[in-house]
Curated annotation (Swiss-Prot):
Species in which this protein is naturally found: Pseudomonas savastanoi pv. phaseolicola (strain 1448A / Race 6)
Keywords: Ribonucleoprotein, Ribosomal protein, RNA-binding, rRNA-binding, tRNA-binding
GO function terms (MF aspect): rRNA binding; structural constituent of ribosome; tRNA binding
rRNA-binding in keyword set: yes
GO biological process: translation
GO cellular component, one term: ribosome
Subunit field text: Part of the 50S ribosomal subunit; part of the 5S rRNA/L5/L18/L25 subcomplex. Contacts the 5S rRNA and the P site tRNA. Forms a bridge to the 30S subunit in the 70S ribosome.
Annotated protein name in UniProt: Large ribosomal subunit protein uL5
Family: Belongs to the universal ribosomal protein uL5 family.
Length: 179
């Protein structure tokens, strides 16, 4: 079992049950999935960009990546319908907890000039989104072998009913929020 999953079951869930005054342990908010997305606007001119992004995201997550395609043509962005414009991957269960553990203990401390995560990046339903400017903060990526620095979006989907419950859950996981 993943280390963070065990900590959630033994320490975080009982503590949150008390803190949020819930009657049943199944009501306690939990992280259901983590979605990583890399939007690749520069892939329009160069198909190799998609291949490199797929390889990077597969190294980071240890899971097969899905290429996303443009739904409709947009002349202003020089995009045609059906062209590959990004990659994404959804993590659940043990892989999700292992990724979250690596993100909190290894990757976020490696961010340059890191002052903490924005506590206002919740969506109103307890889900949290954050952006990473460089993929090299992950230990799986070798700095010498990358072709370009790319950012990615990380979304944590929770069962929390509102932002306060979601914030309490992520604080219990020791997320380094700014305020």
């Amino acid at each position: 079992m993943a280390r963070l999953k065990e900590i959630y079951r033994k320490e975080i869930a009982p503590k949150l049950k008390e803190e949020l005054k819930l009657s049943n342990v199944m009501e306690v908010p939990r992280v259901t999935k983590i979605t990583l997305n890399m939007g690749l606007g520069e892939a329009i001119g160069d198909k190799k960009v998609i291949e490199h992004a797929v390889a990077d995201l597969e190294k980071i997550t240890g899971q097969k990546v899905v290429v996303t395609y443009a739904r409709k043509s947009i002349a202003g962005f020089k995009v045609r319908e059906g062209w590959p414009i990004g990659v994404k991957v959804t993590l659940r269960r043990d892989r999700m907890y292992e990724f979250l553990d690596r993100l909190l203990s290894i990757s976020l401390p490696r961010v340059r000039d890191f002052r903490g995560l924005n506590a206002k990046s919740f969506d109103g339903r307890g889900n949290y989104s954050m952006g990473v400017k460089e993929q090299i903060i992950f230990p799986e990526i070798d700095y010498d072998k990358i072709d370009a620095l790319r950012g990615l979006d990380i979304t944590l989907t929770t069962t929390a009913k509102n932002d306060d419950e979601g914030r309490a859950l992520l604080r219990a996981f020791k997320f380094p929020f700014r305020n």
